[in-house]
Amino acid sequence: NQTKCNHGNLYQVYHHFNLNTANNALAEKIMSHYIHYMHGINPNALTYLTKMSALGADRSVNTIYHGWFTEGSALWDDVRTSTYGPAPGFIPGGPNPNWSLDGCCPSSCGSAVNNNLCNITNPPSNQPALKSYKEWNTGWPQNSWEVTENSIYSQSAYLFLLSSIVNQSASIIPIANQIE
């Protein structure tokens, strides 16, 4: 997701600095395509932000990898099954066609219990590049962080891209605090 947002940001900078004003409309259109990608117009039909259903997303990210949100946590693991799930607005790493199990798999992870975790999961494996995504929060040796871990790099790239369409003249409507 960071790569997608950074590509959109290239067009934002191109437009912002008027590098070729004849192409500004095209740059705006391309930026909006990248924003739409993050908001669900992508091969997975998934809004790549956590817990966005209450804000109108048809299908948003329900779980991400994070050391604090341990798999099966009754409080934080998954929006659908935990008390809270991850907070709204986290962005997972995104599709990763290079995801793989740890090198200790299938039989050198230190114990039979660990070796039993060495299951190839499909997806993300054996999928086209942009479909190589799965929502899960399993640590070593499945290494779900390669797909679902959030990072400041992805968050900031998305926010920079999103800032390209923010209407600076927006006003707050007193009823229901909605942006006009």
Labelled PLM ranges:
Residues N1-I179:
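Aromatic (Trp/Tyr) and acidic
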